[in-house]
């Protein structure tokens, strides 16, 4: 868009049969389906936020996911609501002490697999209820069979804020990402189903 506005000749080539890459949305019975997984736009940069709002109206979606472990609902990412539900702790200091106590009881100096790595970071309670099942489903393997380097850190927040992102602005385009990208590409030549590397 900016290159076209500056008077440049532009060509967008996409190997796929549609624009928008991994943020492509397709209307299915008046519902915008994110074909490559949900994407939530988020930024703390007001200039960026104002820019994308030139091409799309955004809803006020705030990502506040929860996890269901055997009928128990926990807030994600791990925060004080999670720790209160797990252990009945109320203050960040109590939660930090509980995590340190659990990590010390397990004490893994050199994690050999993902399970050991996760427990060394957040202790067995959080791992068992909120990491193990999800990770094994995602990778299709037991956590003990996965390398430790997959998890370098696990986000832990010692606040009662359930917002997944810390950014000031977030949302999803009301008409979908594809419509937003169409507006950005207005007047730009687009070639679909073209493999740039083969031609």
Which positions does each model-derived feature cover?
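Dinucleotide-binding Rossmann-like beta1-alpha1 core, especially the glycine-rich loop
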Residues: 29-105
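Glycine-rich FAD pyrophosphate-binding loop
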Residues: 2-29
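Active-site/ligand-binding neighborhood in enzyme catalytic cores
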Residues: 72-74, 81-199
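Short His-Asn-centered micro-motif
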Residues: 13-15, 43-44, 175, 192-194
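Central helical "cap/lid" subdomain
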Residues: 20-21, 28-36, 193-199
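Conserved beta-strand segments of alpha/beta enzyme cores
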Residues: 9, 32, 57, 189-191
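Structured helix-beta-strand junction loops
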Residues: 6, 54-55, 121, 187
